[in-house]
UniProtKB/Swiss-Prot annotation:
This is Protein Rv1078A. It comes from Mycobacterium tuberculosis (strain ATCC 25618 / H37Rv). GO terms for cellular component: cytoplasm. The keyword Lyase does not apply. The lineage of its organism: Bacteria, Bacillati, Actinomycetota, Actinomycetes, Mycobacteriales. Residues 35-54 have a biased composition (Basic residues).
Length: 82
């Protein structure tokens, strides 16, 4: 087959690279067929307890009104729990 000019529609179709996800999947599948490494799910890091931001940097926000607390509980004498 002669070299197709790049603007030719067929050339556009053939030159589009394989979607990378698809390429990875086929590679892993081939591995498994060959007895190689089985597909490892991309491991999510273990969800540790989310660290609360340091209390000094927590913005002073109004209290949750559903608890009916007055104003900003950070600086109120009653504290977070009445």
């Amino acid at each position: 087959m002669s070299h197709l000019p790049l603007h030719h529609p067929a050339a556009v179709v053939t030159l589009r690279p394989l979607r990378p996800r698809a390429a990875v999947a086929t590679r892993l599948r081939r591995h498994r067929l060959a007895g190689g490494p089985t597909r490892r799910l991309r491991r999510r890091p273990a969800v540790t307890r989310r660290r609360r931001p340091d209390r000094r940097f927590v913005r002073c926000r109004p209290s949750p009104t559903r608890r009916g607390l007055p104003g900003c509980w950070r600086h109120s004498s009653t504290g977070p729990h009445t």
